[in-house]
From Swiss-Prot:
Pfam families cross-referenced by the UniProt entry: SMC_ScpA
Family: Belongs to the ScpA family.
Localization per record: Cytoplasm
Gene3D superfamilies named among the record's database cross-references: 6.10.250.2410, Structural maintenance of chromosome 1. Chain E (1.10.10.580)
Quaternary structure and interacting proteins, as annotated: Component of a cohesin-like complex composed of ScpA, ScpB and the Smc homodimer, in which ScpA and ScpB bind to the head domain of Smc. The presence of the three proteins is required for the association of the complex with DNA.
Keyword Cytoplasm: yes
One record GO biological process: chromosome segregation
Disulfide bonds: none
GO cellular component assignments: cytoplasm
Protein's UniProt name: Segregation and condensation protein A
Function: Participates in chromosomal partition during cell division. May act via the formation of a condensin-like complex containing Smc and ScpB that pull DNA away from mid-cell into both cell halves.
Gene that encodes it: scpA
Keywords assigned by UniProt, alphabetized: Cell cycle, Cell division, Chromosome partition, Cytoplasm
Length: 249
């Protein structure tokens, strides 16, 4: 018999103790030698009682279970006339115990893995979120009545139309213009209208391709600043730019 050498409080329950005993004997968990395991388990329980320690009821229940399994396996098998047509494999008395042990072992291994991950995580330190209130100027991004895809589609359609109408011979002149200047230009055109409203393509008349791009970017910036909004009555209808704000008063 393997020498008993473990602390009484080293186990989390009877299944934990059984796994320890099986490990000491170095036997297959699916082929537990019940006589030897039961004897060692009972020795553990007796040791606890001799030390006047409270023996948890779960240990006593397991002791009774082990003794019952041991008794079943020691009973002589009756020699019966065998009908091989209806022969079924006799159930092993240890099956239920083995199933519980395997389930407990899986949980124990999972708990060990989680503990290792917790130890790894302890080496990382999270930085609390910064207060960015001082960087908030209160400006909110304008909610578009039309999507950016709608605007890009209208812009590309306008570029194709201008390309078709472009004369065969043109004189190219370089004229740099900033987005801020074009924003003022767009607001100026809207201000000239009674209702401060223009059709989208009316903002892009008589311009080079480069100027068209600058105008489009200026329009996006004006929308961001909530100085204008782009509207569309229904899907695939013309886009309209509506001025708003004190700049148009």
């Amino acid at each position: 018999m393997v020498e008993m050498n473990f602390k009484v409080d080293a186990f989390e329950g009877p299944l934990d103790l059984l796994l320890h005993l099986i490990g000491q004997l170095e036997v297959d968990i699916y082929d537990i030698p019940m006589a030897e395991i039961t004897d060692q388990y009972m020795e553990f329980v007796h040791t606890m009682q001799e030390m006047e320690l409270d023996v948890a009821s779960e240990y006593l229940v397991m002791a009774a279970t082990l003794l019952a399994i041991k008794s079943k396996m020691l009973l002589p098998k009756q020699e019966l006339e065998i009908d091989y047509d209806t022969l079924e494999e006799e159930e092993d008395p240890r099956d239920a115990l083995v199933e519980k042990l395997m389930e407990y072992k899986r949980f124990k291994e999972a708990a060990k893995e989680l503990k290792e991950k917790e130890a790894e995580r302890s080496f990382y330190f999270s930085k609390p979120p910064m207060d960015l209130a001082e960087y908030d100027d209160g400006t909110k991004v304008a909610e578009l009545d039309v999507s950016l895809n709608d605007m890009l589609s209208a812009f590309n359609k306008m570029l194709r139309r201008k390309k078709l109408n472009k004369p065969l011979h043109t004189r190219i002149t370089t004229q740099e213009i900033s987005i801020d200047e074009r924003m003022d230009s767009v607001l100026g055109k809207l201000h000239q209208q009674v209702n401060h409203r223009l059709r989208f393509d009316e903002l892009f008349e008589e311009q080079t391709k480069e100027q068209l791009v600058v105008t489009f970017l200026a329009l996006l910036e004006l929308m961001k600043r909530k100085l204008v909004e782009v509207e569309q009555a229904e899907s695939f209808a013309d886009l309209y730019v509506q001025g708003k704000g004190e700049e148009l008063s």
